[in-house]
Amino acid sequence: MKIRPLHDRVIVKRKEVESKSSGGIVLTGSAAGKSTRGEVLAVGHGRVLENGGIKALDVRVGDTIIFNDGYGVKVEKIDNEEVLIMSENDILAIVEK
């Protein structure tokens, strides 16, 4: 199944980020107390402005992004992958390569 986000929405595949506690315990996801990373799989055509114009999105397909855990709406198994749909406003940063 193919999915195409509308307007300023973005389809994201979550990437787990590991970190270690001071005791050497590996923490993942929300237990790490950090933002979550993900890969952008698809983007909408842009945000509709009050004057009817379209503002293109800053994120692109393939970008690695950082967002707070809990943002986005889970969509179960699109092409056997769990993905999130979120607004570009929910994205905190793009990870530069």
Curated annotation (Swiss-Prot):
GO terms for molecular function: ATP binding; metal ion binding; protein folding chaperone; protein-folding chaperone binding; unfolded protein binding. The keyword Transferase does not apply. One of its GO terms (biological process) is chaperone cofactor-dependent protein refolding. The keyword Chaperone applies. Heptamer of 7 subunits arranged in a ring. Interacts with the chaperonin GroEL. This is Co-chaperonin GroES. Belongs to the GroES chaperonin family. One of its GO terms (cellular component) is cytoplasm. Keywords: Chaperone, Cytoplasm. It is found in: Cytoplasm. Its main location: cytoplasm. Together with the chaperonin GroEL, plays an essential role in assisting protein folding. The GroEL-GroES system forms a nano-cage that allows encapsulation of the non-native substrate proteins and provides a physical environment optimized to promote and accelerate protein folding. GroES binds to the apical surface of the GroEL ring, thereby capping the opening of the GroEL channel.
